[in-house]
Each structure stands twice: as structure tokens, then as C-alpha cells.
Amino acid sequence: MGLSSLPGPSEGMLCVILVNTALSISIVKGIVRSFLGIVGISLSPSSSSPSSVTVSSENSSTSESFDFRVCQPESYLEEFRNRTPTLRFESLCRCKKQADNECSVCLSKFQGDSEINKLKCGHLFHKTCLEKWIDYWNITCPLCRTPLVVVPEDHQLSSNVW
């Protein structure tokens, strides 16, 4: 009857308690974030300025500090409309080979009289499809994830100066 190599009950309990505490905190954090997202408050990693609107991957800090950013989809949609003009498909693509072009959101082909938006990245989408995309709080291109509205460089620099 040798000595047992298994830990005693009191030794193993500390690890179990720590793991359960960490998991519980993570779950509560996820629930709070989901609730705030439903209410209309999005959490974004903050840069040094609380008034920053967007944070690029270069500027994001690794700390866990967050700022609350309330952004109405209507205001973002208006800004998108002001910066991205609506075009007719026939005026943009006068070539005969129009069968290749389709909207990646609704998967239907562009007609000659279709109102489309051409993004900075070069992708084409129906105006209504892209506006519906923005209504669902998506602020990037559906295909390549580049920002729909580009923040000017001088605005980004001024928002990162404390």
C-alpha cells in the first residue's frame, strides 16, 4: 500500500475554482457585450482619444480598455451616401460582357438600369443591397472587408494625439 500519486481533494479544488471563475467571467462579459450590441452600444478597442470613431488594426492597443461608441446606422448611412455616389450600371460598364457581373449580396445579375455603388476597393453592389448591409451594422465591404467610409489621415492622426 504505497503512497498515492494523485493530488488530495484540497489541492485540486483551487485549480477547479480558478478555471470556473475565469469561465464565468468570460461568459458574463459575452452576455453583457451581446446585450449592449442589441441596445445599440458597440464596444470598440479604444485608442488614446475617447472621441475616436474608428480604430485601425495598426492603432489598436492590446489593453482591455474600451470606449462606448453609440453610432446610429442612419447617420453612417447618410455619410456613406454623401461619400459614395450612386451610378447606373450601364454608365459604368459599357462593355458587352455584362453576364459576369453580379451583386455578391443578392446574387442577381446587374441590369443596365440598376442603381449601383462602386466602393473604393472596386467592388460593385446594388444600392439597396449595400444600404441593407449597412442597416445590419456592417461597415466594411461584404467581399474584402475594407472600410466603406474611409477616415481621412489627418483625422486619424489628430484622434490619436493626447
Curated annotation (Swiss-Prot):
Record keywords: Ligase included? no
Entry superkingdom: Eukaryota
- From the record, what ranges are coiled-coil? none
Q: Where in the cell is it found?
A: Membrane
Q: What happens when the gene is disrupted?
A: Contains lower amounts of endogenous abscisic acid and is more resistant to abscisic acid treatment during seedling establishment.
Q: Where are the zinc fingers (RING-type)?
A: 103-145
Question: Annotated pathway, please?
Answer: Protein modification; protein ubiquitination
Tissues in which the protein is found: Ubiquitous. Higher expression in actively growing tissues.
Chief site of localization: membrane
Q: What class of enzyme is it?
A: transferase
Topology of this chain in the membrane: Single-pass membrane protein
Q: Name one GO cellular component term.
A: membrane
Catalytic activity annotated for this protein?
A: S-ubiquitinyl-[E2 ubiquitin-conjugating enzyme]-L-cysteine + [acceptor protein]-L-lysine = [E2 ubiquitin-conjugating enzyme]-L-cysteine + N(6)-ubiquitinyl-[acceptor protein]-L-lysine
What does induction of this protein depend on? Up-regulated by salt and osmotic stress. Not regulated by abscisic acid treatment. Up-regulated by the DELLA proteins RGL2, RGA and GAI.
Q: What does this protein do?
A: Function on abscisic acid homeostasis at post-translational level, probably through ubiquitin/proteasome-dependent substrate-specific degradation.
What name does UniProt use for this protein? Probable E3 ubiquitin-protein ligase XERICO
UniProt organism field: Arabidopsis thaliana
Identify the coding gene: XERICO
